[in-house]
Design a protein with these regions (language model features):
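Metal/cofactor-centered catalytic core regions of large enzymes
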Residues: 3-205
Length: 205
């Protein structure tokens, strides 16, 4: 049903003259510029850059699933609003496929089932983060590459870490998206910014 709905929405947009006029040839973003600015995720894949953290550095169960990053082959000018729309449509299809594969591979039986709120499925936090210890991890979220860095604070801080640093993809992407508005009409700004899928809460962190 979900895949059928994607197809319906896709046809709705792709058959809309207004949508095509307002998205094609608008808000070009060059792949080399995005790489230099640190832009990741579907925005850079829309420009033909084949990079996805889940594919390049597999974690969790991604290596056990049959999938490939959704990458658009944009024009020499770079990716426009329509390219960014296209890559997200393909990502929805791929995500649905990955969820179905994960459900098929998920072990069954009463031993693996827990009621919502069961303490067995809740993460157990350590009593404290020892001083001098640290950890970092990067992963792919819906808008690009995220990274968390945590440094332990020792006994004096209880469970509170000494330092937490977050690298969110939108914090990097939004300043670059503003550059893509140069030379276009004021009326194009909502389409250009919206095509980058901004999240103000993530940007503010």
């Amino acid at each position: 049903m979900y895949k059928r709905q994607i197809q319906e929405y896709e046809a709705l947009f792709d058959e809309s003259t207004v949508f095509l006029v307002r998205s094609q040839g608008v808000g070009y973003a060059k792949p080399e510029e995005m790489i230099n600015h640190g832009v990741t995720g579907p925005n850079v894949r829309a420009a033909g850059v084949d990079y996805d953290v889940r594919w390049a550095h597999p974690y969790s169960v991604y290596s056990e699933l049959d999938w490939q990053p959704s990458v658009e082959r944009s024009s020499i000018k770079g990716a426009d609003c329509y390219d960014r729309y296209r890559v997200r449509v393909e990502e929805m299809r791929m995500s649905a496929s990955m969820v179905l594969q994960a459900l098929d591979k998920m072990p069954g039986g009463s031993e693996t089932y827990h009621e919502p709120g069961d303490p067995k499925i809740l993460a157990k936090a350590p009593s404290r983060a020892p001083e001098g210890t640290y950890g970092s991890h990067h992963f792919e979220d819906s808008r690009g590459e995220s990274m968390f860095y945590i440094a332990g604070g020792g006994e004096g801080r209880g469970k509170m870490p000494y330092r937490v640093s977050i690298r969110s993809p939108m914090f990097i992407t939004i300043p670059y998206a503003a550059k893509c508005m140069i030379g276009y009409k004021v009326a194009d700004i909502p389409a250009i910014m919206g095509s980058f899928d901004p999240c103000i809460g993530e940007t503010d962190r």
